Structure formats: C-alpha cells, structure tokens
Design a protein with these regions (language model features):
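Structured, non-membrane catalytic/scaffold regions adjacent to prosthetic-group chemistry
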Residues: 2-363
Length: 363
C-alpha cells in the first residue's frame, strides 16, 4: 500500500491514514483547473500499489460477452476524449452542519472537498457497448481493490450509477488528469469519472465493472453515502435506509475573504465558487452583508458549462464592525440554495448546500 501523496504545503489534513485532506480556501481560489497537488483527497482505505502494466479491467454481468482489458488495450481500442469536470465529496462543507449540531465520527470538511480537473480517457458507454448490454440492465456497478475497515463487514470500495448515466457521453474511464498520467493518489492507473455526481461514484483504481438489474450491494452504496432523516439513529439504520446520493446538489462557497479576516471597512471584493451538479449550470450568485436584507449580484466568470463549477466575484460595501458575509447561488432550473444549515442537517453530514458565510471584522 502507498503512503500519503505529495501535496502542496498547507493542505488541511483530516486524517493521515487513510489520507483525507483538502486545500485551504486561498489555494483553491488560485486556479479554475485545480493542480494535482492541490486537488482534495478522500479515501476510506489504504491506497493500493498497482503496476499499470499488470492492471486489468474486467467487465461482465448482464452482457452478451465479458471483456478483460489491459491499460494499453483500453487506450488503443477506444477513442480517447477529454472532459472537464468538478468532483465534490458528499461531505463538502460538513463543518457548517457540525457548527449547528455535532456529527460524531465524521471528518469536518470545509470548503475544499471539491476540485476541478481535465480528465482524459475512454467513454464508459463505448466499453459497455463493446460488451453488449442486456435488455434488463438498470445499474452499472464498480469495484476497486482498496479495503475499507469502516465498512461493515470490511470490504473493498465500490458503488454504482444508473445505466442511463453510465451510458451518457461525459462518463469516463480516465487515465489522465490535467494532461498527465493519473497518479495513484487520484485513482491511477484508471478511475471512473462521473461528472455531476458525488465523488464517491467516481470510483478510483477501478478493476471490475458489472452490468446488473439492481444497485450495487457494496457498503458504500447501501450503507454509506445515503441521506438519512434528521432524527435517524445511525446505530439502528439498515442497508438501504435513506436515499442513495447521486447528482450533486446546487452549492456555493465564499473563498475570499476568509473567515476571521480583518479588513478595512468599505468596498470589499468577495469571491468564491458555485456548482450546480449533474447537467445543470450556475446562472446567478448573490452576496449580502446584512443578513439577506439586500443583495449584490455577483459577476460570473467564464461561460456556463455542465459538470464544472463557476468562479464568481462581487464588490460589496462592508460596514465597520463584525460582519457576516453570505452568498446564494441559482441554477438553470431556477433552484436556489436553502438558507439555513438547520434545514439540511442530517446525521451523516452530507449535502450541506445552505448559504455559505464568512465573518470578518472591518475597521
């Protein structure tokens, strides 16, 4: 098993082994395409050591004929494509939920459990088409070799997505990230990339793909990464309880100024990111310094594209004293973020897409 990856100094490490870390706000704000050394890391078990020459992908289940592919065969048999996509952990911004009510046993992820990269690989749909999908396939399951001790019982990581998403042209079996061979830390030699879905569905180190007529039975599909009611007792929940998480909920975050900053009163630049998830796009971001009494519409960077975040910035007047700056995003379906963390609190701390806020002191 490999050790923690080489990362930029200043990463916020929530756990060393297995490695779980996120970049600070300032580092995340520097690049629309996140450098590999800044990209967040989320693991449930030790990272496996895989020789790319020995790696094999087995595709089977409800197919006309199974496939076994080496990396070279995957790269040469199927046309490579590049997709820019944001990955976001379902626990992104969990710290905001924890501030409202404690969530024992979970990492206090801040604003940085999300990053964007250029991914290059084969379309999953092309590989599935080469196998010939059966008529009754509803889900495509992925399995990896990294054993997760937290699973009950301990088992390798896995999950699944609906076949309609799996056969969408944006879903990849990726072997490159930002123009370089995919590192072990980010799932190399090959990982699944499912744009618009929570990061857990973009299974790293994928070694088996199964076409089936039901969602994956893996712990991380049936036990973890499920949205439970606020009053659920996690000690009594059973596999399949709650809602399996898939598409990312509309979200935004303030990256500058940082929480706790001291700054001059008056015009202040506020900047951050917004992400709509699935194939939706961000169309508007508003910023307030008076609790939502008045709003300033932010300027959105670049053109809206599915599967990627949009950076935004606004200039607002910050009065003297202790001031809470908040933001809210709107997407192409006219959905808007919920206001309060209390509204979305849940016992696993997933999907905190309430209004982000930072508190500054102006003088």
């Amino acid at each position: 098993m490999t050790s923690a990856p080489a990362k930029r100094a200043g990463m916020i490490v929530h756990e060393q082994e297995p490695y779980n870390a996120e970049p600070p706000r300032a580092a995340l704000a520097e690049h629309v395409i996140t450098p590999v050394e800044v990209f967040y890391g989320r693991n449930h078990g030790a990272m496996p050591e895989i020789d790319p020459r020995a790696w094999r992908l087995r595709v089977g289940g409800m197919v006309e004929h199974a496939l076994e592919l080496s990396l070279a065969e995957l790269q040469h048999r199927f046309a490579p494509v590049e997709v820019t996509a944001t990955l976001q952990c379902a626990g992104n911004r969990r710290a905001g939920l924890m501030a409202y009510r404690d969530i024992p046993g979970q990492h206090p992820w801040g604003a940085g459990a999300t990053s964007t990269a250029r991914w290059r690989g084969a379309r999953l749909t092309d590989v599935l088409h080469a196998c010939g999908l059966g008529a009754h396939v509803t889900d495509i399951a992925f399995d990896a070799p990294d054993v997760a001790p937290e699973a009950d019982p301990p088992q390798p990581f896995g999950g699944s997505i609906p076949v309609d998403k799996a056969t969408a042209p944006e879903v990849l079996l990726a072997w490159e990230m930002n123009g370089e061979a995919l590192t072990t830390a980010h799932g190399g030699p090959v990982r699944v990339v499912v744009p618009g879905y929570i990061g857990a569905r973009s299974v790293k180190w994928v070694e088996r793909i199964t076409a089936q007529d039901h969602p994956s039975d893996n712990f991380f599909q049936q036990g973890a990464y499920r949205l439970l009611p606020a009053d659920a007792d996690t000690a009594r929940t059973r596999p399949g309880d709650g809602v399996a998480l898939g598409p990312v909920a509309l979200d935004s975050e303030i990256l500058a100024p940082d929480d706790g900053d001291e700054l001059p009163a008056g015009p202040t630049r506020v900047a951050g990111y917004a992400f709509a998830g699935d194939d939706r796009t961000v169309v508007r971001v508003d910023v307030t310094t008076d609790g939502g009494g008045t709003w300033v519409q932010a300027q959105l960077d670049a053109q809206p594209t599915p599967w990627t975040w949009r950076f935004w910035h606004a200039r607002v007047d910050v009065p003297p004293g202790r001031v809470e700056i908040m933001a809210r995003a709107w997407d192409s379906t006219a959905a808007v973020q919920p206001e309060h963390a209390a509204t979305v609190w849940n016992p696993k701390g997933y999907v905190n897409n309430s209004w982000p806020s930072v508190t500054v002191t102006a003088s």
